[in-house]
């Protein structure tokens, strides 16, 4: 049988650098507070070669970075102790400009990456943007429990 088309908006946004980080922060916030995270609770700053995310939960500040390309990763590794979590995407901007995408003019690369990221962000808003509310994931967790750790994307 085929995979279900049922998914979450959060999964859609995984195609961009920072999508995994936002999903992790949403889950962490929910499991620590019992509440859904609103976007205005995450402070996002564009840095020279990465994005920085900060989220306060109680007295704790969770510090994250998302980085794309290996050359930028090498720079982030020099300051890795500043972060609790680092997301790494090999392709510039994430999968949206990766090897599986149609080859486009490189002189418009930044414009294309931004447009593709915006399209995914809009698509994310249409569906459920909270990974822990995905009914398919809940069903799998109920059925297989700890066995999933070895087979799911992590």
Where are these regions (language model features)?
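Iron-sulfur (Fe-S) cluster-binding modules
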Residues: 1-154
